[in-house]
């Protein structure tokens, strides 16, 4: 009888352990999935930002070429400039959407993390999880802060180059180009400073991805 009782206890323990493992694995799997999705959104936004900066460089080059004095082939240069302006505007809008999606995913990720955290009965585990979540939340909060200045600078630049495009569409003569040259020079100067305002955004995004990678993404969102 004692043997049977002991055997029953062992079987019960094994079953309970298996159930706990399955539940833990399911939680970990979901944590990894959400962490991967969150990191991917940040990577997409960062890539879009860098591509937008590269497109600004192209717009800068075409504008600089367009305002050269006594040049030939003005029409083709204006068309190239117009195409660059439109492409820059399109990429800026997409970047804004990507950043909004990134922030939405981050909010959902942290909310899910906190929800799982409340189920922990081990105080030390709850504390460790809370510290990791707070570190990520701190990193996340820096991105929109840094993005505001860059977005304002980018929108201001776009407004300038679009107005130059509109004016030249009305008057593409040498005199017309000469008249917008001061505004063009200002746009070129402002565009040249965009990378400076973008640097803190890139740094903030890199910090987020670094925090996500620290100790493995499986440790995030209640993964351990």
Please give the residue ranges for each predicted region.
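Long amphipathic alpha-helices with heptad-repeat character
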Residues: 42-56, 85-88, 92-106, 143, ...
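Extended amphipathic alpha-helical interaction segments
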Residues: 98, 102-182, 199, 214-215
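Long amphipathic all-alpha helical oligomerization modules
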Residues: 30-40, 155-224
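C-terminal motif of bacterial Sec signal peptides marking the signal peptidase cleavage site
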Residues: 19-24
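Bacterial N-terminal signal peptides that target proteins for export
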Residues: 2-11
